[in-house]
């Protein structure tokens, strides 16, 4: 069930679902596993907000266990492609692709709340079928792993060798540890201004 918000104006009452109301404040919420449907929605929202105002920041709140690498990369590439800075804010958990998207936010605008958790690891594989197909899938997994590690090294400033070592197994971090690692830039408790969008 998605809550609705009622707004009063001179023209009368208007009802919004909560996510549409947040979108008016340039807030996008990723609160599920990352799949193609969710990625398409988030990409569309980012493109819409860019068309509305290419100069104003977009705020991507993340509470996600991760999900599809391909779907996540569609979101990531759009974040880098559009003109507005995308500020990423971790609430709850940003794991796997969720952590990757968190790190991919605009430098200086990657945030976690104090009791959030961040987890990085290598991509998961599940190859089945004939040996030749498994070989193709194994090569693809290695390509994805190397790509993600290189991008994490870029966004965190960590050496590639350390990223490879630290993502070999599930690696959970507190916000303070994630800040020290370079995945985020700030740990905040309260927004500096009352506006929903004032977290930059």
Swiss-Prot record:
The keyword Magnesium does not apply. It is an enzyme of class 3 (hydrolase). Its EC number is 3.4.21.92. The active site is at 96 (nucleophile), 121. It is found in: Cytoplasm. It comes from the Bacteria. The keyword Transit peptide does not apply. HAMAP family: ClpP. Belongs to the peptidase S14 family. Cleaves peptides in various proteins in a process that requires ATP hydrolysis. Has a chymotrypsin-like activity. Plays a major role in the degradation of misfolded proteins. This is ATP-dependent Clp protease proteolytic subunit 2. It comes from Synechococcus sp. (strain JA-3-3Ab). The lineage of its organism: Bacteria, Bacillati, Cyanobacteriota, Cyanophyceae, Synechococcales.
